[in-house]
Amino acid sequence: MPANAPLLQFTPPLQPATLILRYKRFLADIVTPAGEALTIHCANTGAMTGCATPGDTIWYSTSDNPKRKYPQSWELTQTQTGDWICVNTMRANELVNLAIEKNQIAELSGYNFVRKEVKYGEENSRIDLLLQAEDRRDCYIEVKSVTLLQQQCGYFPDAVTLRGQKHLRELQNRVVNGHRAVLFFAVLHTGIKQVAPARHIDRRYAELLVQAQQAGVEVICYGFQLSPDGIALNTRLPLLLDEMLSSENAE
């Protein structure tokens, strides 16, 4: 159990259901314990490999916004192997921001201001979080949600991401311009104990990640404790780059 207080509490509590099918990227069909069939919103445009297996137990929230066509939102998956996954990718930025504000991430402490979605860079980007203080360099933070588990390792990305490649170039340029730059992997799958770039999925992203780190971009990985009650920050997780570098040198 993490010593940190919960960052996010689900109010009202999440409700369980059985996943029937995820489709059209943004929708999923479920059946509640009472037998009610629902179509719910899925705020995840990724491949969701291993996160959307029919028959898994999913947990959903319900919005009180009367204008929403699909008031229920898919938040968590409880896999048949007992792992928990936060499939709502919008939560990653929120959780990292809350952890910084609550001073739970030592590597990112000591800043007075947190700004969100600030325009920056040579490729017309927006940074997820910009930390500022009078006596420190500006700190640019790009947050990525990690949920792909393969062979006991968490991988990012789960599909080719030109946008993610652009973000790595932008972060590297921030360092060149004298700023601090951080790639923060928010590991939202409780079965993941270590993280690596998914070279087998997006080779260019993996190459850019190595280049960015060598240029001074910091890569920070943290796990989270997930439950239908809420989400808390867990421990820092290792990033595996040495094996990838060794395999590249051998080619």
Curated annotation (Swiss-Prot):
Alphabetical list of InterPro entries matching this protein: SfsA, SfsA_C, SfsA_N
Q: Name one GO molecular function term.
A: DNA binding
**Would you say which domain of life the source belongs to?**
Bacteria
Q: Which family does it belong to?
A: Belongs to the SfsA family.
Tell me which HAMAP family the record gives: SfsA
For this entry, the protein name equals: Sugar fermentation stimulation protein homolog
The protein's organism comes out as Yersinia pseudotuberculosis serotype O:1b (strain IP 31758)
What lineage, starting at the top, does this entry show?
A: Bacteria, Pseudomonadati, Pseudomonadota, Gammaproteobacteria, Enterobacterales
Q: Which gene encodes it?
A: sfsA
